[in-house]
Amino acid sequence: MQVSDFHFELPDELIARYPKAERTASRLLQLDGNSGQLVDGTFKDVLELVEPGDLLVFNNTRVIPARMFGRKASGGKLEVLVERMLDEHTILAHVRSSKPPKPGTELYLGENDEFHAVMQARHDALFEIRFTAETVVLDILNQIGHMPLPPYIDRPDEEADKERYQTVYNQKPGAVAAPTAGLHFDQALLEQIQAKGVELAYVTLHVGAGTFQPVRVENIHDHHMHAEYVEVPQEVVDAITATKARGGRVVAVGTTSVRSLESAAQDALQKGTELKPFFGDTEIFIFPGYQYQLVDCLITNFHLPESTLIMLVSAFAGYEHTMAAYEHAVKEQYRFFSYGDAMFIRKQMTKA
């Protein structure tokens, strides 16, 4: 398949630049992967769509204030976007400046040069930067960092984004983009879902800035995914095994939860073992033709044209059904991307 197969026209006004006042106030488009049937509704419908015995799997990563502004010792301005923290004092980052800094370049970060750092090495498009202060990276980011809103939101971050660009159940700092399907859940809805007899479980995938990189090849088979760190702990493996045994469904909240679970499944397949905990980097790329091992239903936002994430959805619901659903969403003026509306998708049981 070609990248252009996943193109759709999206009017600019449908890109959500701010979230709704209430998390659960978004709209929800249901898609049945078998029939292609579409149902328009609101996000609170999720409570009716999940059933006792189901398992909801969330990504509990926490978005770090990963964008910093500063200057080189020579005076040139720069912007640093953390891709991942390598240790308590070192980051791997994207750097925007008039000229890329060379190894040994001294950097001053923060509005008032609060923190001194040194560019250590370059790894392809990323820069390894070490802070000289005793303060740990996470504390530095909390002092001078900005929330790394996606480029298409196209506005500076505001105070409200510190809360609204996080899920209510976040636990483990490390992401530079939110697992956005989870933004629709508030504490009350989570409690109602649990009261209905639905189990909740948490994986961790620290979303990298690479999630916003365009696919730069025409044939999707030639695309190489960026690596992201994943944790699928023993309790999640146990919960999935128990859910499948009782005939319940595994409902993944967000494409990052899907990629976490399916990474663990692929690891077990390759090793010829039963499902086991998975801790490590994943470069899993899911596109039509992929056979899902664990996930039965998917809650996800609307994704960018020609992105790896619309390809993942197409593998789940079928290509034709997915593109028809997106056409419907544009026509019905759903809000798109991170702060936008959501879908609830039942997996296509036949091959896409």
Swiss-Prot record:
Membership in a protein family: Belongs to the QueA family.
HAMAP family associated with the record: QueA
EC number(s) recorded for this UniProt protein: 2.4.99.17
Organism (species): Vibrio cholerae serotype O1 (strain ATCC 39315 / El Tor Inaba N16961)
Highest rank taxon of the organism: Bacteria
Quaternary structure (record): Monomer.
Keyword Iron: no
Keyword S-adenosyl-L-methionine: yes
Catalytically driven reaction(s): 7-aminomethyl-7-carbaguanosine(34) in tRNA + S-adenosyl-L-methionine = epoxyqueuosine(34) in tRNA + adenine + L-methionine + 2 H(+)
Function of the protein: Transfers and isomerizes the ribose moiety from AdoMet to the 7-aminomethyl group of 7-deazaguanine (preQ1-tRNA) to give epoxyqueuosine (oQ-tRNA).
An annotated Gene Ontology molecular function: S-adenosylmethionine:tRNA ribosyltransferase-isomerase activity
Subcellular location field: Cytoplasm
Main location: cytoplasm
Pathway terms, separated by semicolons: tRNA modification; tRNA-queuosine biosynthesis
Name recorded for this polypeptide: S-adenosylmethionine:tRNA ribosyltransferase-isomerase
GO CC terms, sorted: cytoplasm
